[in-house]
From Swiss-Prot:
Species per Swiss-Prot/TrEMBL record: Lactobacillus johnsonii (strain CNCM I-12250 / La1 / NCC 533)
The name this protein goes by in its record: Large ribosomal subunit protein bL28
GO molecular function term, any single one: structural constituent of ribosome
Family: Belongs to the bacterial ribosomal protein bL28 family.
Record GO biological process: translation
Amino acid sequence: MAKDIITGRKTVFGNKRSKALNSVRRSWKPNLQKVRILVDGKPKRVWVSARALKSGKVKRV
């Protein structure tokens, strides 16, 4: 399962509830992008969330 190396975001599981409160398992997936960034001074392809990219927490190479 892919995981954001900056924020640690990953797939979350829970229940979808109908009006009658029936439950069905479902998952919420983060918007992960595979990008090249500098990790320890070297370029590396890693999974980063779109939120981390937009907020400027990480810089593309």
